[in-house]
């Protein structure tokens, strides 16, 4: 936040201690020294000299270690600054002459505050000893009151957050003596589906904390704050936080600079012209570490204020974060944003539209159609977020003057053709209503209780992400800056809210939109730009392979097998996409595997050097890595890439959640749709219903499918089979049809319910030999696979007997993935349309995808 370096802050604290000691006539300490991040001083006031050591870390004052020469093994770990530590030791020595007093003090404080700490999950020391030490730390100049020197604009912004989101949406920790404050903004992510949250390693019942470290007394006029992003329960391993932290730091830095040019307060409060000074300004360069948990939240799963004025929280979120800028040549309106509920249908609206230059329609309804004519005469205004219906004062809106109101912006620059395309799909009725070329507007529907999590992202249909059948990159709507009409903190929350649902659409390093043929996928990843690849692999952004193998070894085993199949295919030039981007471990400035200089033989050599995943689970990972590095230094980096480049969420299903009729132990839950597509899918499902069907494809194709999604291969170089029934994704309710597309019937026979019992017995015998740990991993390189998908039963679904064609990729979502090895056969007579089969599928899905 523009403050002094760590060393300067530490030196200032040490100088305070030395100056304070020299000013005392009967000082108990001498020989003050500081070197190698360790501050030492010697107690000389007793019969025995004792040396105390304070070792500071990189995140000082957090993780500060205190020990004495009398007891080196008993070390105190504290978050207090050096002056506080020194004062407590001196105070206790005068009372007890206990040379290990610093440790006893800490024990005492922890005991006294243990109850409060458990309730608040924060480090707050309120004992009398703390007050004494704080008086020393603050120089005794003031009896510190946390509210005394807080900047008035900060007060106003905090009030705006609490009013809009509820009292638990923001918490802060003040350090008045060092002119610092930690502002924790609690971002609700409960709208994410459980499986999507798991794929992103996010706890959806716990808010994401965006912490701002800024000046308590200067606020927007002070230095640019630093930003931290975390969840309390996943602080150690929160991969999404790296991406979001960089996004929020960039946003805060840009908006902070603009704030310095604007000293006005939009809340109507008069700011004092008197310059506010913080007590003990010599500590102004100190700043607390972000490691403190936010006060009042801790492990409590407190959510944001669920309802306000009768509108659900997710609907409010949609209303605040989403809008569209419609390009129309026959309208004078330049910016027409509609959310939440629409105006009542009124033929006069078309005529009145031409008088509007620029306005924003928010998610609150006008009281009646009769009053819209009066409302539309306003030339430039923003409608209040609070509901007008039921408020008699709104009947007099003819006297309204142009004014600022509480609108939010999620710009998306949709063209007219896109809007009509959305309307034709009947997906606008719930969340988006705009008919620029018609005289009537569709009614918005109030979300019911069951669809509250849906209402946030279902309203992003065609806005947060383009149609997956389009080759256009995502729009920059998620990057649009919300209007600051409720203060900087509300603006920051809104920006975080609109970025989180679409993090997967942007590179985790450069934050530029991914450009994929089939639209965004589920898991966030890095783009193919070389600088981003270097940063991703060398700066520790991606997860370690060891972590993935520890939590999902069978999935890693499958990913490696798919990579091998694609690489061994005679069609590898076409289907081995993406090609690896791997930094050379011996030369971090070069790419060992470069998509621009493809060398398939070298990749295969490295792949052959990867130790089997089963062996990795049976020995220390570091030893396995050393063996791989010795055999081929590119083997382990390639394994890292195979894991991190996977953009789908795959989980090995436990035995009790497997589909028994599929006759294979290798069953996986497979989700590849991002939140926006999944929400579009559920909205379409509510309109048309859905069913299940198989999709067969050679195992060599799945390396690309997991990273690019199911694509329409018809009439492209990816097409392997004929497209007799037109362009689209081919599915079948019959397993025998899809088994054929997977190539299973070429080298092995598909079993049937009517075959002799001897065939089934031999199959069962081969499977029974692979029990225990060995059966969890793939034993053969001759693999066949089949996917079970959920498909929307809309008029767009073309059924040609047992072959179905889906031209719209948004109407197909993968749910399960089944792998067969040599000796394993599937049932050719499975029909997903049979009641028993369909019921079993729904049982296994359960609540995992929120589609059952």
UniProtKB/Swiss-Prot annotation:
ADP-ribosylcysteine occurs at 332, 366, 375, 394
Question: Tell me, what's a Pfam family for it?
Answer: PARP
Q: Where is this region: Disordered?
A: 113-134, 289-310, 748-775
EC code(s) of this entry: 2.4.2.-
As for PTM, the annotation reads: Auto-mono-ADP-ribosylated.
List keywords of the entry alphabetically. ADP-ribosylation, Glycosyltransferase, NAD, Nucleotidyltransferase, Transferase
Kindly indicate whether the keyword Glycosyltransferase belongs to this entry.
yes
The intrachain disulfides are: none
CDD domains cross-referenced by the UniProt entry: ADP_ribosyl
Which InterPro entries does this one have?
Answer: ARTD_PARP, Poly(ADP-ribose)pol_cat_dom
A GO MF label: NAD+ poly-ADP-ribosyltransferase activity
- List each copy of the PARP catalytic domain by range: 615-842
Catalytic reaction list? L-cysteinyl-[protein] + NAD(+) = S-(ADP-D-ribosyl)-L-cysteinyl-[protein] + nicotinamide + H(+)
List all Acidic residues biased stretches.
Answer: 123-134
Keyword Phosphoprotein belongs to the record: no
Record PANTHER family? POLY ADP-RIBOSE POLYMERASE FAMILY, MEMBER PARP (PTHR21328)
Similarity section = Belongs to the ARTD/PARP family.
Q: What is this protein called?
A: Protein mono-ADP-ribosyltransferase PARP8
């Amino acid at each position: 936040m523009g403050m002094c370096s760590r060393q300067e802050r530490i030196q200032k604290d040490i100088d305070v201690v030395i100056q304070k000691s020299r000013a005392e006539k009967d000082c108990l300490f001498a020989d003050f020294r500081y070197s190698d991040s360790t501050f030492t001083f010697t107690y000389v006031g007793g019969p025995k000299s004792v040396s105390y050591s304070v070792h500071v870390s990189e995140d000082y004052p957090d993780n500060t270690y205190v020990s004495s020469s009398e007891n080196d093994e008993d070390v105190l770990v504290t978050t207090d600054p050096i002056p506080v530590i020194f004062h407590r030791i001196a105070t206790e020595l005068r009372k007890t002459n206990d040379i290990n007093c610093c440790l006893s003090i800490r024990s005492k404080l922890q005991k006294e505050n243990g109850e409060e700490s458990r309730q608040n999950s924060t480090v707050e020391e309120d004992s009398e000893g703390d007050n004494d030490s704080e008086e020393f730390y603050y120089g005794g100049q003031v009896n510190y009151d946390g509210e005394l020197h807080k900047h008035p604009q900060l007060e106003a912004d905090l009030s705006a957050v609490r009013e809009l989101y509820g009292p638990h949406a923001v918490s802060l920790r003040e350090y008045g003596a060092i002119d610092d404050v930690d502002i924790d903004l609690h971002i609700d992510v409960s709208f994410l589906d459980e499986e999507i949250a798991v794929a992103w390693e996010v706890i959806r019942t716990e808010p994401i904390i965006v912490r701002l470290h800024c000046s308590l007394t200067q606020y927007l006029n002070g230095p640019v704050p630093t930003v931290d992003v975390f969840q309390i329960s996943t602080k150690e391993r929160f991969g999404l936080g790296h991406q979001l932290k960089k996004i929020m730091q960039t946003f805060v830095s840009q908006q902070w600079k603009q704030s310095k040019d604007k000293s006005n307060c939009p809340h109507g409060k008069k700011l004092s012209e008197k310059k506010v000074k913080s007590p003990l300004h010599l500590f102004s360069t100190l700043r607390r570490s972000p490691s403190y948990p936010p006060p009042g939240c801790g492990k409590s799963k407190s959510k944001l204020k669920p309802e306000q004025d009768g509108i659900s929280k997710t609907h409010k979120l949609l209303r605040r974060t989403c809008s569209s800028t419609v390009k129309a040549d026959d309208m004078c309106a330049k910016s027409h944003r509609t959310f939440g509920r629409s105006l009542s249908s009124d033929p006069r609206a078309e005529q009145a539209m031409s008088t509007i230059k620029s306005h924003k329609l928010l998610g609150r309804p006008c009281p009646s159609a009769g009053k819209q004519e009066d409302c539309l005469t306003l030339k430039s205004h923003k409608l209040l977020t609070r509901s007008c219906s039921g408020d008699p004062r709104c009947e007099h809106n003819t006297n309204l003057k142009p004014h600022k109101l509480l609108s939010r912006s999620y710009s998306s620059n949709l063209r007219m053709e896109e809007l009509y395309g959305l309307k034709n799909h009947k997906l606008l009725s719930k969340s988006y209503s705009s008919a620029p070329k018609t005289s009537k507007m569709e009614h918005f529907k109030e979300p019911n209780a069951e669809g509250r999590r849906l209402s946030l992202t279902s309203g992003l249909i065609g806005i947060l992400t383009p149609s997956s059948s389009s080759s256009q990159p995502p729009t920059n709507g998620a990057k649009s800056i919300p209007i600051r009409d409720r203060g900087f903190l509300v603006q920051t929350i809104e920006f975080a809210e609109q970025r989180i649902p679409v993090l997967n659409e942007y590179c985790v390093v450069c934050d530029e939109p991914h450009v994929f043929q089939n639209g965004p996928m589920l898991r966030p990843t890095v783009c193919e730009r070389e600088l981003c690849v270097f940063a991703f692999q060398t700066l520790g952004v991606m997860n370690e392979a060891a972590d993935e193998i520890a939590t999902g070894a069978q999935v890693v085993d499958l990913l490696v097998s798919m990579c091998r199949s694609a690489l061994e295919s005679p069609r590898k030039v076409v289907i081995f996409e993406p090609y690896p981007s791997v930094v050379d471990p011996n030369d971090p400035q070069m790419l060992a595997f470069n998509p621009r200089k493809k060398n398939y033989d070298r990749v295969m050599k490295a792949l052959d050097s990867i130790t089997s995943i089963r062996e990795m689970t049976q020995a220390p990972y570091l030893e396995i890595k050393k063996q791989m590095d010795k055999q081929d230094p590119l083997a382990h980096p390639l394994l890292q890439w195979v894991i991190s480049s996977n953009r789908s969420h795959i989980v090995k299903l436990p035995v009790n959640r497997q589909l028994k009729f599929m006759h294979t132990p290798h069953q996986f839950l497979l989700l590849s749709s991002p939140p926006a597509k999944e929400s579009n899918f559920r909205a379409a499902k509510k309109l048309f219903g859905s069913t299940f069907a198989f999709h067969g494809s050679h195992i060599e194709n799945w390396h690309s499918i997991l990273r690019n999604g199911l694509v329409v291969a018809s009439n492209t170089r990816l097409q392997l089979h004929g497209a007799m029934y037109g362009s689209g994704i081919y599915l079948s309710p019959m397993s025998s049809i899809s088994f054929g597309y997977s190539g299973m019937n070429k080298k092995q026979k598909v079993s049937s319910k009517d075959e002799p019992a001897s065939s089934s017995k031999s199959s069962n015998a081969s499977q029974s030999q692979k029990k225990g740990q060995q059966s969890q991993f793939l034993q053969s390189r001759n693999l066949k696979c089949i996917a079970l998908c959920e498909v929307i039963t809309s008029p767009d679904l073309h059924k040609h007997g047992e072959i179905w064609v889906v031209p719209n990729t948004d109407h197909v979502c993968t749910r399960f993935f089944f792998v067969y090895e040599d000796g394993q056969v599937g049932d050719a007579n499975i029909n997903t349309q049979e009641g028993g089969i369909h019921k079993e599928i729904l049982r296994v899905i359960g609540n995992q995808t929120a589609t059952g």
